[in-house]
């Protein structure tokens, strides 16, 4: 009896995972798979939309080569926005193409100063204008009317984007000019805002000068390459 009194049953050690643990692991794995699939799904859609845009512009222009070149001009324009935004430390999405409506990039930010916003907006037409200029130079050197017409459309596309209309780059620049013109200068003491002073309108004038200068160059390029041949 004494032996039975001292007997202690052996407890199972290191049993398998509980049902709850298994469910948690399955859920975590499903979340990783779902997130990855969603991410690559967006990448596929953007990649597919690029080629759909080429096909759409082929119907418009009647030439695969010209359609590809035109879409590449749009791509360079959007990359101009993206590069400047990245230079400012912002997160930028890959360009999303919409046939016959161009393309766009999404920029995540918690509010930008008018100066930073204007630089991002102007960077697209600047990059697109440089791409059109490259087409023009190569077209002249090779006597290629197709490249010169492509340059003309590139200048036109980027000049159009600088119209001071809300959803275009020019609309963003116009808003930046207005905000810079009205925005008061805040005087700080010890890191604490103490007084609102009269606006410093130098930045507004600089933005306006950059805007007018770039628009003028694009229009000049468009006029210089007008009526140079067929597709």
Question: Could you say what each language-model-derived stretch is?
Answer:
Residues 1-231:
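Hydrophobic transmembrane alpha-helices and their immediate loop junctions
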């Amino acid at each position: 009896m004494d032996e039975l009194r001292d007997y202690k049953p052996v407890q199972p050690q290191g049993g398998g995972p509980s049902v709850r643990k298994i469910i948690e692991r399955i859920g975590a794995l499903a979340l990783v798979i779902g997130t990855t699939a969603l991410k690559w799904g967006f990448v596929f859609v953007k990649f597919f939309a690029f080629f759909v845009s080429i096909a759409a512009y082929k119907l418009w222009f009647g030439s695969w080569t010209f359609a590809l070149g035109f879409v590449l001009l749009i791509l360079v324009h959007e990359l101009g926005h993206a590069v400047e935004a990245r230079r400012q430390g912002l997160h930028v999405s890959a360009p999303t193409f919409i046939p016959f409506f161009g393309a766009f990039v999404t920029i995540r930010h918690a509010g930008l100063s008018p100066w930073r916003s204007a630089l991002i907006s102007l960077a697209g037409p600047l990059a697109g204008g440089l791409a059109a200029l490259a087409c023009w130079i190569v077209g002249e050197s090779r006597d290629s009317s197709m490249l010169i017409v492509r340059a003309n459309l590139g200048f036109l596309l980027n000049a159009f984007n600088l119209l001071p209309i809300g959803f275009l780059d020019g609309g963003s620049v116009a808003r930046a000019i207005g905000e810079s013109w009205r925005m008061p200068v805040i005087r700080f003491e010890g890191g604490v805002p103490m007084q609102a002073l009269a606006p410093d309108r130098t930045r507004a004038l600089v933005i306006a000068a950059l805007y007018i200068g770039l628009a003028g160059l694009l229009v000049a390029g468009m006029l210089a390459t007008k009526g140079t041949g067929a597709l």
